[in-house]
Amino acid sequence: MKERTVLFVDDEENILRSLKRGLIDEPYKTLFANSGKEALEVLEQEKIHILVTDMRMPEMGGLDLLRIVKERYPDIVRIVLSGYTQVTTLLTAINQGEIYKYITKPWELEEEFKPAIRQAVEYYNSKLSNATV
């Protein structure tokens, strides 16, 4: 099975540092962007399979990023990682961004976060294999 690439997007450096440390031994390639704009630049240069984004970021918020990714890269599995848990925001992300999962901050790395990302990779792989059948 080919290695999959996960792009994590968050404007908080401490979140990205924590993810880099915590995910170093995971069976997928990790890339990081500190804004929606930077994420779009990475998406133009790299083959991304999973996108994990914060919702509240300056300039381009997570919802705008999700909409663009859904339109330009519909095969990417989209996940929200956010401390912003207002129900209307969650429903908008689900409906407009067609997200696979919504993970709230703070998260439990071993019991919640890592398994969720692995499941997203498995989901991507199953979508791919079903498309080729």
Predicted regions and their residues:
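Two-component/phosphorelay signaling modules centered on CheY-like receiver
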Residues: 4, 13-31
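Acidic catalytic/metal-coordinating carboxylates
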Residues: 4, 34-38, 61-64
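Active-site residues of response regulator receiver
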Residues: 10, 54
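Acidic, metal-coordinating helix/loop segments flanking the phosphotransfer/catalytic sites
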Residues: 32-50
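Short amphipathic alpha-helix used as the core "switch/output" element in two-component signaling
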Residues: 41, 63-75
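Receiver (REC) domain active-site loop signature in two-component systems and cognate sites
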Residues: 57
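Alpha4 helix (beta4-alpha4-beta5 surface) of REC/receiver domains from two-component response regulators
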Residues: 64, 85-103, 111
